[in-house]
C-alpha cells in the first residue's frame, strides 16, 4: 500500500494528459563543460547547508526551481524487508517543507531520482540485488503520485532522456542499463516489461544518482568505487560520468577527490548539477541522518 503524508493526495493511475516540456539549453552547456573537466580540475567549495531534519539514508537529489527533492530510505529491519521510503521537499536553507512516503511492502528502497520538467521519477525497490521495483511519477507542486509500472529487477536510479523521450534505469551497482521508450502523448513506457537492456561497460564507479541533461540525450551519473591495498584501509573514491543515453555508454569520466572531515567521499550519496555563468555547480549530500549539502563550483 502506498502511504502519503501530505494532505489527501490520492494515488493516481498514470495519466494521459501530459504537459509538453520546454527544452532548456542548460543541458548541452552542462554536458560540454563537463567534457572539459579532467583529474586536474580544481574544485572550489562555495557553500555548506546543514539540513535541519533527519534525512535517514539519502539516495537521489533533484533541483526544481529553488527547491531540492530528496529521496531517502529508512531501514527498520533489512533482513525482514521492512522499511520506509521517503521523498522530501527541502528549501534552499535546508529546511523541510513537505514529505511523502513511497513504497509497497518489501519495496521500500528509493533510488536515484530525476526531474523531466513536469514530473519527478522515483524508483522504489527491494533492498537487495536482482529483486524488483515499482516506478512512480510525482508532481512536484501537488505531490500527487502516479504508480507507473513494476519491474523485475532492483532499479538503483532513473534518468530522463527528454530529447529522445526515453526513460533509463540502472540496476544494483549500475551493472546493467535498462531503457524504455515513452509513448508519444503519455509519460508511460511503451513496453514496461521489455526495455532495451545492455551491460554497463564502464566499471569506474557504481552509480548512486543521475540527472538527465535537458535538450540532450546525455545524463550525468555520480558514484563511488571502494579501493584498498592489501591489508590497508579502504578508500572510497568518487567519480562522475557523462553517459550517452542513445548508446548507453559513458563518454567522459572524471574523478572527484573530495571527502568530508570524516573521510566520506562527497559522492557517497546523491548529487545534483547546474550550469553557472562560467562553469558548473555541484551539490553533494554524502552523509546519513544529519546531512550537510556541500556546494562546489568548477570552471
For each predicted feature, which ranges?
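A short helix->beta-strand "capping" segment at the edge of beta-propeller domains
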Residues: 30-54
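A short beta-strand motif characteristic of beta-propeller blades
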Residues: 45-51, 96-103, 144-149, 192-200, ...
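Repeated scaffold domains used in trafficking and secretory/extracellular systems
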Residues: 55-60, 105-112, 153-161, 202-212, ...
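Loop/turn-rich, solvent-exposed surfaces of beta-rich toroidal or solenoidal domains
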Residues: 203-247
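Structural motif
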Residues: 79-86, 130-136, 175-181, 228-242, ...
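Beta-strand-rich domains and repeat architectures in extracellular enzymes and scaffolds
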Residues: 49-79, 83
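Blade-loop segments of beta-propeller domains
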Residues: 85, 94-117, 121
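Short loop/turn segments that connect beta-strands within beta-propeller blades
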Residues: 91-94, 139-143, 182-185, 245-247
